[in-house]
Regions:
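Acidic, serine/threonine- and proline-rich low-complexity intrinsically disordered segments
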Residues: 1-121, 128-133, 138, 143-152
Length: 154
């Protein structure tokens, strides 16, 4: 898993046929990350975290989040590199699974109106993350979106 902004120069130089080859191999070019979806699966995460702990010879008390969770609100997690290794992106105390974050971005794009840049909060967004409406609003703010109430809507 790579943060897209860390490899943006490399990605700009990739030809479309090279991108197609990578896509055919399972590489996902998301808004925020470039990743292999197969590496977010539980078995791959377990193996990667085991190897990571053995390589660094510390952090043995760190455990990956429960598989199946898409959203975490945890102020105790300090090691963002470990969480990224587990497939989660950090937004202060919120963690969102990378593939879910990309799907959320698609929902946001699809819910925005053409005449302005407003997005409407739809239940599918909350269901995708599995978080409360309040936490979702806070997450959007941490992702640099502006939140405002509009006649009982968000």
């Amino acid at each position: 898993m790579l943060k897209r902004d860390q490899v943006s120069e490399y990605l700009k130089k990739l030809e479309q046929n090279e991108r197609k080859i990578l896509r055919d191999l399972g590489v996902k070019f998301g808004r925020y990350h470039v990743f292999l979806y197969q590496l977010i699966k539980p078995e791959a995460v377990s193996l990667r975290t085991l190897l990571w702990k053995n390589f660094y010879q510390k952090f043995h008390n760190l455990k990956p989040p429960t598989f199946g969770l898409n959203f975490l609100d945890d102020k105790e997690i300090k090691n963002k590199n470990f969480m990224l290794l587990c497939g989660f992106e950090r937004f202060d105390n919120f963690f969102v699974r990378i593939d879910i974050l990309e799907r959320l971005f698609v929902l946001i794009i699809n819910s925005s109106s053409k005449e302005n840049s407003e997005i409407k909060l739809v239940p599918e967004m909350l269901n995708l993350l599995g978080c409360s409406k309040d936490n979702f609003k806070k997450l959007l703010q941490k992702m640099n979106y502006k939140i405002f109430e509009k006649e009982n809507e968000t």
